[in-house]
Amino acid sequence: MIFPNIDPVVHIGPWALQFGPLALRWYALAYVAGILLGWRYALRLTRTASVWGARTPTATALQIDDLVLWITLGIIVGGRLGYFVFYMLMNDDQRAWLAAHPMDVFKIWEGGMSFHGGFLGVCAAIILFARQQKIDMLRLGDLIAPVAPIGIFFGRIANFINGELWGRVTDGPFGIIFCNETIQANHPQRICPAGPLPRHPSQLYEAALEGLVLFLILAFAIYRLKWLRRRGALVATFLLGYGLARLALENVRNPDVGMPEFPLGLTMGMMLSIPMILAGGWLLWKSLKEPIRDDAEAHEPA
């Protein structure tokens, strides 16, 4: 299967939405879609009394509206800093490029975002916001965790549209040749970095597992298990679910070029996901030990 010839810049008819070096890209639209749909889902959760029992919802609609800005900044700043620390500084070629072009670290529109960096940025945003609003930060995390797979899903679809983060070579029926005129035109050397062989569409695998499947698991935990009443359970489920999915899919995802060799054949994605699994397992064990407190003890949102 040949990769579809999709321009990463959004077009309206024959016109590209581009102004000099700035362009509206599918990747940017994915962020917008993930944030907007996640915001609406979080609002819906706060308004669904059945998932809270006798407890007061963790945050008000107004607080959710304010939190969106904090989370957006966390995603952008954390995602870029994470890519800089976890990937650019670990890569000899990229370190040399940065030494010659230090301002490129700010060119977010040219790509280069790390999920794990964005995750840490969102965690920081939640902690700071919770302290400011005097909200239990773990319960606030429980409200935001079910939202995250929405953004992950759209982000991975955008990775596929961009023809980036492809998988390893395969002769299976799902193999895709990530090479077309658009990819060549957007590469400085006018080549297809993925080469001429079919590869796993690992972006779509990740969209399915880290996005759709994880969203459904968390929704089941909310609506059937009533885990919004169980402090930390949804955060733990997200950490475990994402970490395990990413750990498994790193085996079909093409290793990052130029990265050093890690022990036991691990990749950077694996090394960053293992702590999520360990933290999620410990937090879920701790959460399940405590009885569900189906009362209004939590707090009254400010």
Swiss-Prot record:
InterPro entries membership: Lgt
GO CC term, one of those recorded: plasma membrane
GO biological process, any: lipoprotein biosynthetic process
Membrane-related topology note: Multi-pass membrane protein
Coiled coil: none
Protein residues bound to a 1,2-diacyl-sn-glycero-3-phospho-(1'-sn-glycerol): 156
Domain of life from the UniProt record: Bacteria
Swiss-Prot/TrEMBL keywords: Cell inner membrane, Cell membrane, Membrane, Transferase, Transmembrane, Transmembrane helix
Pathway: Protein modification; lipoprotein biosynthesis (diacylglyceryl transfer)
Gene Ontology molecular function, alphabetical: phosphatidylglycerol-prolipoprotein diacylglyceryl transferase activity
Class of this enzyme: transferase
Name of protein: Phosphatidylglycerol--prolipoprotein diacylglyceryl transferase
